[in-house]
Amino acid sequence: MTIALGRFSKEENDLFDIMDDWLRRDRFVFVGWSGLLLFPCAYFALGGWFTGTTFVTSWYTHGLASSYLEGCNFLTAAVSTPANSLAHSLLLLWGPEAQGDFTRWCQLGGLWTFVALHGAFGLIGFMLRQFELARSVQLRPYNAIAFSAPIAVFVSVFLIYPLGQSGWFFAPSFGVAAIFRFILFFQGFHNWTLNPFHMMGVAGVLGAALLCAIHGATVENTLFEDGDGANTFRAFNPTQAEETYSMVTANRFWSQIFGVAFSNKRWLHFFMLFVPVTGLWMSALGVVGLALNLRAYDFVSQEIRAAEDPEFETFYTKNILLNEGIRAWMAAQDQPHENLIFPEEVLPRGNAL
């Protein structure tokens, strides 16, 4: 009896193996299978944004100037959302709205849907890139899990919220001042700052900043001296194998400061991961609620008492009046197609007027 020893070999010219070998080859910039999604989508999203902010007006969608060509600067230029009348149309270049006319497509706001969708898939591609690389070098996938938080915020704000409203028109435009205007809109129409999910998001982001500052300062404070350089960057060898800071010293320091301290690095770093990621996830969940017009906290008893008693006022009732003012002024400006006209007596007036 003859026994053949060896490994079963597939056909040499297997297309998948050829692609896999080329995509995952060790090179300066890793491509990978995720790169097939990431690089084209990121290229188109950034290219669309630069094109829109440089050349394309928002006159036909918002009645605004929004490009460098019209005199805007980096803070005021934007790729603006399509008109409200276009509802949730994908605004494909070859669709019934633009009918293949690139100029008309830009005028209708087609670049916004182009940037939003390619941007979302580009971010997802970047997360998959982290999964793929982590698997290749046998790391756990916590980087990718952490990056899911900003993806959740992007998708909820730019896609899910306008899908719950009457159209893409109510999403943020892609620009600095445009995002600020959207924040004011969220406050006036949804009382967003009093929403518990927003509160959790703020706690997560600011808490993460505090943790990051404390952690960096503590590590710097407890570094061992192993060189004669004048400063941190010259005194330490970045390629040394051993740790160069003292967890024990750091633990004792914070135990004396607060009475409690992290006892091991895994729990410390997991907490630094957990705080911002959970905060962003909660914030994204809150925006999904706003898409369905769920309300924030309402303290109706205070509103009723403030309406009946001119001497009773709280910071809450003052903010409610401010929100009414935002709605009254913003609705007419933001939605000129609705021909909203508010009588002078219903517009809020400051004490100086």
Swiss-Prot record:
Chlorophyll a PD2 binds at H198. Its EC number is 1.10.3.9. GO terms for cellular component: chloroplast thylakoid membrane; photosystem II. Fe cation binds at H215, H269. It holds the Pfam family Photo_RC. InterPro entries: D1/D2, Photo_II_D1/D2_sf, Photo_RC_L/M, Photo_RC_L/M_CS, PSII_PsbD/D2. A plastoquinone binds at H215, F262. It is a multi-pass membrane protein. The modification Phosphothreonine is found at T2. The keyword Transmembrane applies. It catalyses: 2 a plastoquinone + 4 hnu + 2 H2O = 2 a plastoquinol + O2. Disulfide bonds: none annotated. The chain crosses the membrane at residues 41-61, 125-141, 153-166, 208-228, 279-295. The modification N-acetylthreonine is found at T2. Chlorophyll a ChlzD2 binds at H118. Its main location: plastid. 2 of the reaction center chlorophylls (ChlD1 and ChlD2) are entirely coordinated by water. PSII is composed of 1 copy each of membrane proteins PsbA, PsbB, PsbC, PsbD, PsbE, PsbF, PsbH, PsbI, PsbJ, PsbK, PsbL, PsbM, PsbT, PsbX, PsbY, PsbZ, Psb30/Ycf12, at least 3 peripheral proteins of the oxygen-evolving complex and a large number of cofactors. It forms dimeric complexes. Belongs to the reaction center PufL/M/PsbA/D family. This is Photosystem II D2 protein. The gene is psbD.
